[in-house]
Regions:
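Carbohydrate-associated surface elements
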Residues: 158, 181
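A short beta-strand/loop micro-motif in the catalytic core of glycosyltransferases
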Residues: 91-92, 147-157, 176
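A conserved mid-protein helix/loop that constitutes part of the nucleotide-sugar donor-binding site
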Residues: 20, 206-224
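Short His-centered aromatic/hydrophobic patch
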Residues: 93-98, 117
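A short, charged, and often flexible helix/loop element on the N-terminal side
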Residues: 46, 50-85, 129-130
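A short helix/loop element that forms part of the nucleotide-sugar donor recognition site in Leloir-type
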Residues: 188-201, 207
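N-terminal subdomain of nucleotide-sugar transferases
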Residues: 1-47
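Nucleotide-sugar donor phosphate/pyrophosphate-binding loop at the beta->alpha transition
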Residues: 111-114, 122-144, 161
Length: 224
């Protein structure tokens, strides 16, 4: 089965959790014999790995939109990605940046569109500061794509609740929880109290640890 994964981020251009998620997802899909996983990502051409030639495509902003609002530049890339998905059997988009590419591909090729919900535009109103009027466009893109998607994957039960609260038109049966996983071949617990003490942490006392970008959306202020 050919699956096309659509994302703004993909190594080496990764700046957030969604990019890490997509990279690990694609690695797992490409390890399967029954899946041919293609990647369509924003940005400069990526180096190809042996045995994966022709499976990863990159898309730069359209030159004609170089001075346009960022949301319009995103839609320009989405159009190019949708054209590049010819031959797909299923498209899987991540974040609003790639959602419209997935939505258009589903319409154009009559294939299922699966969306992974990493964050939601209605819950990030401060993005209007970054995108200006483009925030209305990004919100429209997300709503349109989610409401038409064959399935929505939420990374937690709380995210599923947020999806249904933000977009009540979506059938709850189409929203599924798939938690972010950890590859235990690469990550496993290491018990080393001496090393922990070297880092200035007392292993005999409870610790509260935050791992993530220090941005408003992460809710660090609530933890503090």
């Amino acid at each position: 089965m050919r699956v096309d994964v659509l994302s703004r981020e993909y190594p080496p251009e990764v700046y957030g959790g969604a990019g890490v998620h997509v990279a690990e997802l694609v690695r797992a899909l490409r390890a399967r014999d029954d899946v041919e996983a293609h990647v369509h990502a924003f940005g400069a051409p990526r180096p190809e790995q042996p045995g994966e030639e022709g499976l990863t495509s990159s898309y730069a902003d359209l030159a004609e939109l170089s001075g346009a609002n960022a949301a319009l530049r995103t839609l320009g890339v989405d159009l190019a990605i949708a054209a590049g998905c010819a031959g797909t059997e299923l498209v899987h988009s991540h974040t609003w940046y790639a959602n419209m590419a997935g939505h258009l591909s589903a319409l154009l090729y009559d294939v299922p569109h699966v969306v992974s919900a990493h964050s939601l535009e209605p819950l990030r109103p401060w993005k209007a500061e970054q995108l200006g009027g483009g925030y209305a466009i990004s919100s429209w893109v997300e709503r349109t794509s989610y409401e038409a998607a064959a399935a929505v994957i939420a990374v937690s039960a709380a995210m599923r609740d947020d999806v249904l609260a933000s977009y009540p038109a979506i059938d709850p049966a189409r929203v599924h929880v798939v938690h972010n996983g950890i590859d235990t071949a690469d990550w496993s617990p290491r018990v080393d109290p001496a090393r922990v003490r070297e880092l200035g942490v007392d292993p005999d006392r409870p610790s509260v640890v935050f791992v993530g970008r220090i941005t408003r959306q992460k809710g660090l202020i609530h933890l503090v």
